[in-house]
Amino acid sequence: MAPTQSQSRATTRWSLTRLAQQVRPHPTLLLLIRSNPMGPHSAWSWLLPLVQSNPMSLRQYATALQSFVLLLGTTGCPRELFLDLYRFIPTLTRTLLTSLGCGPGGAVVLRSGYRSLVLACSLGVSLLLSYHQGLIPRPSGTQACCLTLSLMLASLSQFLS
């Protein structure tokens, strides 16, 4: 017997709620973003020395992104942070090594273009989940999703070049 529409909706809601409950932002990353001494126009620049000196795994990137999303939800106006991230991604991809290797503790060191693409795509997914769970207000969420889409396209073009 096929599931009813209400059962499908309940299953989807349960799945999304379960995923949102697994979002555990790393407190140090959140603190670094909130207390950035360099001002709002370089809110992401702390990432650069971090990834150069200690390559992050995809899991660490995902944790960082969850922190970003929760922060964007608490600021109420994510546009500035998104535009800043949009400007910062090319700096990150130009500066990092473009080789594929193995980092400390077995973490995969990915090509820089791939890193920025993963960053943008994960941010988009995190935003949609946070938006669905009500962590981000409706006007900010809509605007943030549009900006994330343009960021993903920019990252994809850098990855393909």
UniProtKB/Swiss-Prot annotation:
Domain of life: Viruses
Pfam families: DUF1478
InterPro entries documented for this protein: Sapovirus_VP3
Family to which this protein belongs: Belongs to the sapovirus VP3 family.
Protein name: Uncharacterized protein VP3
Organism per entry: Sapporo virus (isolate GI/Human/Germany/pJG-Sap01) (Hu/Dresden/pJG-Sap01/DE)
Species lineage: Viruses, Riboviria, Orthornavirae, Pisuviricota, Pisoniviricetes
